Amino acid sequence: MARETLLLVEKCAHCFSWYDIETGQRLYSLQLPDYPHEFVTDSAERYAYVGHYGVETSGHVGAGGHSLLQIDIRSRQLVRSIDLSPFNRLHGLQMDEQDRLYALSEEKAMLLVLDSPSRDTAARRAVPSGGVQSHLFALTRDGQTAFCMNLLSHTVTKVRPWDPLFAPVACHPGQKPEGFALSADERTLYVSNRWSQTLVAIDTETMQVKTCVASRDDPTRLYLQADGLRMLVTNYGERSLSIVDSLTLKELAHVSTGARAIALSFHPTRALAYVSLDDDRVGIFNLASCEFDGYIATQREPDVSKVVVL
């Protein structure tokens, strides 16, 4: 019988876990090297690829990790570790519509590409991000264009992973850009600036800021809802969520989270979001009522998640 399952990285428990969404029961945990972080799945949801960031946060020093961890979602087994040395502190991950895998080395500020991640033993290509401390990135569906969030240079840069002669195009949207969301038509990139405490909309063609509004304290991540009309903002400093209009970036609703919201994911068919909180819970947030329906108790520091049916 099919079961809706929440896949969850628990960063400070150093594992990848499977949770039953209906009961909140933890079904299994797979131990990983210290401080795994972001993950993506292929389109068939056969494999998850976890980046071994290897340090607790972007503010922690250290060489960090240099491997991608390939996990079989159904057998709950670590298939292999893909060593991407010398590229380290692997953080942002994306997959394009052809299931090609893109990984961002924060320390080396390089965007790496694995054409066939289930078989490749090394990156097949790499392009510089054009920034410093490149943390996360947005990717167009075809994989031809990426937009890197560069924490220390305070820039967002447009790069083309498949064009080795393309020079990165930079935009300065504010101080410490981190959160991002790409519109469905890929013409607008939304970015949250943690130190400036602003939300901006960037024209992806010109790389110019077209809208900028004040945010709440320390907006870390942005998540565009399926209808494209509303966006969720995790306000890390204020311990809250904001729901904003994606056209104007004006706040429509505001909800206290009690603890700091680290990341969230949407249910694929229901109006629910699963919000990872730093008090070791995942909150089940009802997008219709803008209230939490309940919580799932987790291990230390739940992070990136995804709902799958197994």
Q: Locations of the language-model features?
A:
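Predominantly soluble domains enriched in secretory-pathway, periplasmic, or organellar proteins
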Residues: M1-L310
